[in-house]
Amino acid sequence: MSETSFNLISEKCDILSILRDHPENRIYQRKIQELSKRFTSIRKTKGDGNCFYRALGYSYLESLLGKSREILKFKERVLQTPNDLLAAGFEEHKFRNFFNAFYSVVELVEKDSSVSSLLKVFNDQSSSDRIVQFLRLLTSAFIRNRADFFRHFIDEEMDIKDFCTHEVEPMAMECDHVQITALSQALNIALQVEYVDEMDTALNHHVFPEAAIPSVYLLYKTSHYNILYAAEKH
């Protein structure tokens, strides 16, 4: 499936279908074959610099479908996020529209357990981008509110405010471990990132936060994130 054949998030397809992305690359072929022993399917995301936020948002909400107790717990957390944004210095009128977009899709998941309805929202450019912008602002707020911790992980020449203003909040800015750590903690979402590179080494992955049981799995390759689906354990 080429990136031009879908809008923002693709339909689910077999993990081995991505072997044809690089048919001549022996290392890539081996690593995807290894990955297929633990993951059955993949959804591709558009490579627009927002792929991490969009992939995490969609994948976690999809994992909540049909789980009323977990949805309620997540709603309670989401309802607290405006306080986090206010504490970080954001004015309510500047984030309310983005918060409403995200909260609306959480309510949709609560009322409608269909994958197609959720996918439709995330493939609508306007709705999807508002959701991404909210997740970016929340990530920024979490970092700003814990500046003493996060300042150890960013460039010494850039303070926390500048980092958030230039590297986190703007659309299309790619993310790194700092943003992943912040957003996963801000929403209490455990995720596992599988790394596929062109080094002739073993596959490796990272769990955020460490030792947590992931509910979201992402594939990272050449600065891009796609959504993975783990094989059922028997």
Swiss-Prot record:
A Pfam family:
Peptidase_C65
The UniProt GO MF terms for this protein read: cysteine-type deubiquitinase activity
Keyword entries, A-Z: Hydrolase, Protease, Thiol protease, Ubl conjugation pathway
- Site location (Required to orient and stabilize the active site H-224): 226
Q: Where is the active site?
A: 48, 51 (nucleophile), 205, 224
* GO biological process, alphabetically ordered: protein deubiquitination; protein K11-linked deubiquitination; protein K48-linked deubiquitination; protein K63-linked deubiquitination; proteolysis
Q: Which segments constitute the OTU domain?
A: 40-231
- Listed EC numbers: 3.4.19.12
PROSITE patterns, per database record? OTU
Q: Which PANTHER family match?
A: UBIQUITIN THIOESTERASE OTUB2 (PTHR12931:SF3), UBIQUITIN THIOLESTERASE PROTEIN OTUB (PTHR12931)
* Family to which this protein belongs: Belongs to the peptidase C65 family.
Report what the protein is called. Ubiquitin thioesterase OTUB2
Gene from which the chain derives? Otub2
